[in-house]
């Protein structure tokens, strides 16, 4: 959102919503579009369908990503986050397993039967990305905004691990994300854990900073 009642856009940059889709259902469509870009990249490498996919970081992007992994045919989706409430929400949204980063089950190295086939990091944190790289057999994609350099070394190279950056978001990705919503394969409404009038913007920001909220939906005219 733009934290305003009205925002001008070029008409060609807008998507018309189907009559059956509400504004609440697509309030986070821009985020879903961005996550879709990463899944389009993974799909080109056949890294989702039939694979054991890990999602690192269960903020809004991670909660979108785990649903997309299911929609695109992942055999199993493993959600990783240190916050219990976010792991619980991930399970409600369909993750097969939700674990803390220090969970022994999650500590499997890449040669372990429980290792991941592919993974998507949604945190941008070095510790998360490198943990995924150590536990993934084929591909690790980085969606989260990278905050510091990560180490891709000889061990990753010798076993053929692929590390993907992020491509530009685009209209096609937005249309694909919208189609997942229409088909009932992507539910964005649980991301908005709080709803406030726009006049209480500062309160909403504090809820986000303190991690009491995942996303805050502001009502422009309330």
Identify the function of each model-found stretch.
Residues 3, 82-89, 148-153:
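Short, glycine/polar-rich helix-capping loops at beta-to-alpha or helix-loop-helix junctions
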Residues 117-120, 141:
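N-terminal Rossmann-like NAD(P) cofactor-binding module of classical short-chain dehydrogenase/reductase
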Residues 171-222:
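C-terminal hydrophobic helical "lid"/dimerization subdomain
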Residues 126-183, 220-222:
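Glycine-rich phosphate-binding loop and adjacent beta-alpha segment
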Residues 1-15:
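Glycine-rich phosphate/adenylate-binding loop and adjacent beta-alpha elements
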